[in-house]
Regions:
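Enzymes that bind and transform nitrogen-containing heteroaromatic metabolites
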Residues: 1-145
Length: 145
């Protein structure tokens, strides 16, 4: 599974419960990836609200909750992620400093290895798309005897 998250320069994802930014060119980029893989992208109703009617509904699954069995999940809110099911992470870097009160953080035991970096020129500025391969480590806590 691939998780997609948009972040600002400080790892911020939300401010006052709302997305920091949105971009038409990035949405097209995402839908093109999913279409090329003959797949679908899962997202919350909140995330789906930024997609227009003509933006290929057949490629999207709108869900309140995720099973993490989906091929792609576009997340805009900090939710618990089953990292052991994640193979790839796509970070859309806004390359801007925005106000934020929720941040994207990797938990201990999750390692991301950068595979590819792309630049997308949007209507207002250039976005950096970073694709990572995700590895999880099993951490075992030994009980005191």
């Amino acid at each position: 599974m691939t998780v997609i998250i948009c972040v600002d320069n400080n790892g911020g994802i939300l401010f006052n419960g709302k997305r920091q930014s949105k971009d038409r060119i990035f949405r097209k980029y995402l839908l093109d990836i999913v279409e090329k893989k003959n797949s679908r992208i899962a997202m919350s109703p909140y995330t789906y609200s930024q997609f227009k009617e003509d933006e290929r509904k057949e490629l999207t699954d709108v869900k309140e909750e995720f099973s993490f069995d989906e091929d792609y999940i576009f997340l805009e809110r900090a939710i618990p992620i089953l990292w052991e099911k994640v193979n790839n992470l796509i970070l859309c870097c806004w390359n801007r400093d925005y106000p934020a009160d929720e941040y994207f953080n990797l938990p201990i035991g999750v390692e991301c290895i950068l595979q590819k970096t792309e630049e997308i020129v949007s209507d207002s500025h250039t976005l950096t798309i970073e694709t990572y391969e995700v590895h999880t480590k099993n951490w075992y806590r030994k009980s005191k005897e």
